[in-house]
Amino acid sequence: MSDIKEFISNGFVIKRKLFSNEEIDKLNQYIAIRQDKEKSARETTTSTGKLTMTMWNHPSEDLFGKFSTNERIVKPMEIFLNDEVYHYHSKIIWKNPGDGGFDWHQDYGYWYHNACLYPDMASCFIMLDKANKENGCLKVLKGSHRVGRISHARSDTPEQTADNERISELEKRHESVYIEAEPGDALFFHANLLHASDANKSQNSRRTLIVCFNTKSNN
């Protein structure tokens, strides 16, 4: 199956070794030196513990910006979404040993409230560390983007997640796929694809750089 057919059918595409070990090592070294002091970090409490993320809206001229606007990400995005795209925002998920996961949700469940009329949006999830079930890798409901936007609400924690009743039914019909991957691998996924992650039960970090895009016609 071609990448575009896979994206349309499943809602996601995995590109192995989109970035080399050297490129990821360089980015990780840059993160360690910068400690991301100039970005806005925030900690949230989820159903399985705390989770820290760093988010920014405008790609700068630094190494973060170079990754966020790299043609290896942008060109596939424009093919998958069939339109010119622009950088919506980027973030780093800092998932240290013992940190929590995140319940099932859709990105468009949030972005819908930012005056984005259509779900013609997607994200690229770049692995900075090895990702596996033990350290809380991402998991997706294959093909769930086709159900459309699901209502999101707060449960017992500050996070907003997808309606539990609908999730229960969808889990019966859609395969849950764990995205186990190596540093430099990347996951492209539709804004309506349901995704989640479990807590990090390992002794290793699971950091990811996520670059999100909107289509020009949806601005």
Residue ranges and their predicted role:
Residues 14, 124, 187-189:
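Short hydrophobic-aromatic micro-motifs
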Residues 133-194, 198, 218:
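Double-stranded beta-helix
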Residues 2-10, 15-115, 153:
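Non-heme Fe(II)-dependent double-stranded beta-helix
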Residues 106, 126-130, 142:
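Short, structured patches in soluble enzyme cores that scaffold and shape functional sites
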Residues 114-133, 180, 212-215:
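Short, conserved beta-strand element in jelly-roll/cupin
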Residues 83-90, 100-102, 120-126, 136, ...:
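Generic beta-strand structural signal
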Residues 34-46, 183-188, 192-219:
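Non-heme Fe(II)/2-oxoglutarate
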Residues 19-21, 92-95, 99, 131, ...:
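Short, solvent-exposed loop/turn segments at secondary-structure junctions
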